[in-house]
Structures are given as structure tokens and as C-alpha cells.
Regions:
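C-terminus-biased signal that marks the final domain/tail of proteins
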Residues: 4-137
């Protein structure tokens, strides 16, 4: 657990907290910002992606999944936890926005070219947050 400005790793070690997630400092994969940044940079630089759009998008979400915040690991207030609410990327050339949410890891896409690009109305889409489980039997 982590609460800002509080060392929850051990009262026997004088750790100075500079980031939420430091309650796990010293454990492999701690949740501090610096550790998460280093882990995602390492993962990005050492992972292999295919040439296609779908493979690249899938790999992007796997890379960022290496630093997801899970509910319960980083407590910020009573009953409140730091989590990865959503993850997103965009193919700026094709105008496609991809996202996943905490509760729905299916990749959702919004193709901006399917809308009136010269329109004057704001277009909004509800986040698809309901988990979809694909039963194969």
C-alpha cells in the first residue's frame, strides 16, 4: 500500500518518499514513478512488434500493461486507490484512437474519419467499460 508522504515499506528504514507507490520500494517492480518509467522504457526498447497496425497496437498495450496500477496496491485515501483508469494511443496518420479501460481490456477504437471532419458539433462516445468475456464453448 502507499499513502503519499508515508513510508509503508518498513519503519526500520528511513526512506524519503518522493512518489506514490514507494511503499513497495526495493521489491522487484515497485510502484514508484521512477521505477515504472524505467520499466516501461526498458520494455519498449526491448520488445518486438510486428509490421501491421493490429500487431503494433496490441504490442503498445502490452508495453504499457507492464506498468498498470492495480486497485489496492496504492492507497491514496480511505477506500480510494490509484489505478490505471484507461490506456490509449492514436494512429495520427489514419486518425484512429485506441483505448482500453481498467475494467475492459478489450481494445476499442474510434475512427475519426467515420465522422464529419468539417462538422461543427462536438461528437462524444461513451467509454466501453464493461468487461467482455469471450466464452469459446
Amino acid at each position: 500500500m502507499c499513502i503519499r508522504d508515508r513510508n509503508t515499506f518498513s519503519d526500520k528504514i528511513g526512506l524519503k518518499t518522493y512518489s506514490r507507490g514507494m511503499g513497495a520500494l526495493g521489491l522487484p517492480g515497485d510502484l514508484s514513478s521512477a521505477s515504472r518509467f524505467a520499466r516501461v522504457a526498458y520494455t519498449k526498447l526491448n520488445s518486438v512488434s510486428g509490421d501491421g497496425e493490429e500487431e503494433s497496437v496490441s504490442q503498445f498495450f502490452h508495453i504499457l500493461g507492464s506498468v498498470d496500477q492495480q486497485r489496492g496496491c496504492c492507497k491514496v485515501a480511505e477506500g480510494k486507490y490509484e489505478i490505471t483508469i484507461y490506456t490509449s494511443c492514436c494512429n495520427a496518420t489514419k486518425g484512429i484512437y485506441y483505448y482500453t479501460t481498467y475494467d475492459n481490456h478489450s481494445i476499442n477504437a474510434v475512427d475519426l474519419n467515420r465522422e464529419k471532419l468539417d462538422g461543427r458539433e462536438l461528437v462524444r462516445y461513451p467509454l466501453d467499460e464493461k468487461m467482455k468475456i469471450n466464452y469459446v464453448n
